[in-house]
Amino acid sequence: MKKLISLLLAVMMLASMASFAAAEEEKTLVFISQAAWKDQMQVLCDRYYEETGVKIVLENYSFNDMINTIEVKIGTGSTDYDILFVDVPLVSSYARRGMLADLSPYFTEEDRAKLVTAAVEASTYEGKLYASPMANSSQVLYYNTKLLEDAGIDLAELEAYSTDNRITYERLVEIAEQALKVLDPDGTQGMIGFDFQQVDRVYQMNQLPNSMGGVQVSEDGYSLDGVLNTEPWKKALTWYQEQVKKGICSRGITASELPNYFYSGKLIFMLGTTEMVANFVKKDMTTYAYTASPAFKGYEDKVATATGSWHVGVSGYSQNTEEAAKFVKWITCTDEATEMFYDLRGMIPTYVPLLDKLANDENTVGWMKLAITESKTTAYPRALTPAFNEYSSVINSVWSDTRNGEDVEETIEWAIEEYAAQTIKYKK
């Protein structure tokens, strides 16, 4: 009897220990995620749980609420969260304040080589990797085929352009002028020849000086002296202002309003993100085509295209850094997860093996193939600075003031002084 009791006790102890071990092994990680992707992210997290036993709990927020939650929770040192989506221009700011964990120990050089170079650069602060890219954005030049045909423009020329043979901004303006003379000769129809989807915004407008070899900000991220007061920026700002004065580009229309002009047949050419295609489908718009982003004449080898989207990082205050980093690596840097996300969401990948696969697939749509080429060759990240909010505010004003006819030299001088004043606090 004693032997039986001893045996039962031993079995119970082993069962208890096994249960305890299982509880110890099962991890739960909390992810500050965006509501727009909640369904797709849940599918990915469920797959990760099936494979690893690690449960990912999503807390989904709208864009503004997510940014605020990150500032309020992670910014004050909360240990309740492990993983977060990061709007890429904020990586440096978060890293500087200790809000992101260094992922360098978890991503080898071989791993990083599998990610788009510009995206890795945008996630690197002081030589360390603080987030890993999950999705990307790119630019194409859209044009309204019906308007151009009505204006007597031969579409064959536009159809012949590519990433190897780009239309120049100068030629683009010539075609736009020619079309406007037919479509809106006296300027009473409210037609626009060419414009940027995100007019007045640093994300897209900086593509102009960048495409002449201009840089975004000083190496330390805190100065615009030696940046704005250089030939690329002066030429780009002057060129843009001239197009506004001539009536080729618009004035007084906001970035949120401008795409509507393309949908409604009031805008002939629009430089926009690849995500615009989904909007065209929703609007039942069929009279459009696209080509590669333009180059400035004489600067064909300097083409730079706006890029950057969502990256994934680990909270600097997570109590599960290693497990969280493993998840980040899985979701952003493996064949399985990146292909799943692409199939679910259709966004431009940042995982090079998948980009190569799509580029060689005859079923990949044309705009995606353009985006793949730009991502690998011309993508140029936004300013890498902890002071990005201050930077974007100042540079947005530069573009807006230039558009409204302010003196370019005076605008540049103001911006240099204003940014210097706003970044003093970062140097203390």
Model-predicted segments: where are they?
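Short, solvent-exposed loop/beta-turn-alpha elements that line the ligand-binding surface or hinge
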Residues: 104-115, 158-166, 187, 192-194, ...
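Extracytoplasmic/periplasmic solute-binding protein
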Residues: 126-134, 139, 165-225
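Long, aromatic- and glycine/proline-rich binding clefts that accommodate carbohydrate-like moieties
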Residues: 291-292, 342-399, 426
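Conserved N-terminal structural module of periplasmic/extracytoplasmic solute-binding proteins
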Residues: 2, 6-9, 18-96, 106-112, ...
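Immediate post-signal peptide segment of exported/extracytoplasmic ligand-binding proteins
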Residues: 22-30, 49-54, 124-127, 179-190
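Extracytoplasmic/periplasmic substrate-recognition and gating elements
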Residues: 27, 51, 55, 246-248, ...
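Hinge/lid segment of periplasmic solute-binding proteins
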Residues: 86-140, 149, 170-171, 187-190, ...
